[in-house]
Amino acid sequence: MRRLPLDFRDQYFGCEIELTGINRATAAQTLADLFGPRAEHSGGGYDAYRVKDLDGKEWKIVRDGSIHPECRRRSVLIGETYKVELNSPKLEYSEMEKLQEVVRSLRRAGGIVNDSCGMHVHVDASKHTPQSLKNVLSIMYSKEDILFAALKVNPARIDSYCQAVDEPILEEIRKLPSGASMDQLKDRWYQGRDGSDYHYHSSRYRACNMHSVFYHGTIEWRLFNSTLHAGEAKANIILAMAISAQGINQKYTQFRKTPIGDNPAFTFRTFLLRLGLIGPEYKNVRMHLLKNLPGDKAWRHDKSQYPSNQPRPRTGEAR
């Protein structure tokens, strides 16, 4: 029996959003004001605060050392407490609005982002196979140049926290037979030295992080700049979920780069439509993902060149 394609919305997701402008206690209280009744300060190495929402799911505010702290109020002493990371719980697509309201609340409380802040999106990997994970990596390799351009990824982050796909490792992974096991894929990812039990393994710092599959059970996308715009956050999450589903639904992928070309907006819009982001439901998602790219998203070439756009010859004088 032919397997039905996976709807990308039928996947769990979560995210980490880095911010500053407010301290961790304020961020935690903001969540408590939204969900009630209070924030629990559990401390520890990440100085964690925990808040449960109305569904009993736990949201966390933690420290992230990579953030450059800022505050718009000059009278406030800025320090380590202004390095803030929001960790969402495991969410269903139907809970997207809940996440968006958290993002809006943090912005209203004074939260801001800067070039040191990133957003990481996790998509549940439980429906994936070695072949589908191979497909996801190949899709990322193929599209990463235009993805980096569309998302305006900070070059400093590309060099450090969200590097491009490791081409030699991907080549080895693609050589695995169609019936390869997850252990074989893991062996190729770690190059024969299993690091799946080490949280900060160096292989995690990829735009598409497969270390997270073996450590957390999720595929992690690390290439997004942080945002406290609810629509942008939603667009980032949907893009990651759609690529994940495409990896599951495709039988195979090609090992080649997609050229950006002279009309990047059209090239990327075509990719988004192939991911299933079609119609009015995803109009704003497409808008956010395309807004940084030059070109005409509706026409591959100069639209005046198409016969349908040529002026019609006059067939006779008006009477």
What are these model-derived regions, one by one?
Residues 1-112, 126-319:
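C-terminal accessory/tail domains of diverse enzymes
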Residues 114-116:
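Active-site histidine-anchored catalytic micro-motif
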